[in-house]
Amino acid sequence: MPNPEASLSPRSARYPKASMHVVPMLAPNDTAAFRALFASGAVDPASVVALIAKSEGSGLHNDHARVFADVSLRTALAEARGCPVEDLADSVTVAVSGGSPGVISPHVTVVTQEWVADLPAGLPGVGLVVGRGHTEPILPEDIGRTAQVDKVADAVAAAMLDAGVTDPDDVHLVMVKGPALSSRAVADALSRGKTVVTGDYGIGPMGSMCWSNDASALGVAVALGEVKRDLVADDRIRSDWDLFSAVAATSSGGEKRGGEVLLLANSAQSASELRIGHGITRDMADTEGIKTAIRTAGVDFDCCLSPAQQAQVVQVFGKFVLPGSDVLRGQHITALDDHEAHHVAKAVGGALVVSITGQPMSFISGGERNSHMGPPGGNPVAAVVRRLPA
């Protein structure tokens, strides 16, 4: 049952308590396990602040399976709360990533946050906190340009404030779901005498999804001080790969009109039983970056996780992109020539993560060629684990 002493208002309690539940989705409209969290009393629907899901589908700008999953989850939560779906926009961030190739199992990660009177006894150190933000409307002509960078940076700053975090080093993951171009969006821009960054709506090297994702990533980098704002210009987006964020995981879809931001950080003022850490893989074959994320979250291990340590891992969030080069550790690879190369990147990332954690319900996004998410060839990974008593 929900904690009767927990409050959703910080006015009556001091400490935020964030939690996560990961449940399966057997189809884009399958919300049975999600609804069961409410029916069993495991989750108070009023405490939900974010839904982060992986759906089956193409993962492209017009992935209707992703949209179907998004609508299904919103509808289920609204019914549990007894409110119109439209009322969720101001209180819940919904980010659904399409495409679950390889070992990735479709699922939803339910993020909750309540307010409690006391910090947990026996759990030393810092715990997870959650912050949310929304951008101003991102117009079609903004996508992939500095206008989007600035709007996302402002929303990330708001999310930090919402989380009660002042030090960017405490931030380990910033997820942004933004808009991508569509034929309708392009027509709208042209009708107003504006231009757009590309005529490709997809996820290829010139695809609008890549432009949007990378502008959002640079917005994260600017907000966190990873990149100075005066270094970012339109002609450096998707060009200067030395500009990047180590904690951004961004995605986009043609159905969006603005950006939703979810920030996960650690704080000594957190009552959460969870903690987050992050790492960066050095290439498509590297597992050390994943292990670093788990270790920095608080799990101490040598080469492999024990079964008990695997159970301590609540969720892994990974952004796996395609490298700009067709050479991996001195050898030629053909991933860049694959007609569904974006699925290859996700499948490889999923295999790496699941081989370590043993959990197919991991959030693996990606598929872009080159990215401002992580350094050239690298991929940002974040891990949320359960804190153990001292």
Curated annotation (Swiss-Prot):
The UniProt keyword set, sorted, is: Disulfide bond, Hydrolase
Q: Where is this region: RU B?
A: 127-268
Q: Where is this region: RU A?
A: 1-118
What is the top-level taxon of the source organism?
Answer: Bacteria
Q: What is its EC number?
A: 3.5.2.-
Q: Does the keyword Disulfide bond apply?
A: yes
Question: Which residues does the annotation say bind substrate?
Answer: 66, 97-98, 213, 251-252, 346, 365-366
User: What is said about its interaction partners and assembly?
Assistant: Homotetramer; disulfide-linked. The disulfide forms between 2 monomers in the tetramer, such that each tetramer contains 2 sets of vicinal disulfides.
Protein purpose = Cyclic amide hydrolase of unknown substrate specificity. Catalyzes the hydrolytic ring-opening of a cyclic amide. Does not act on cyanuric acid nor barbituric acid.
Q: What is this protein called?
A: Cyclic amide hydrolase
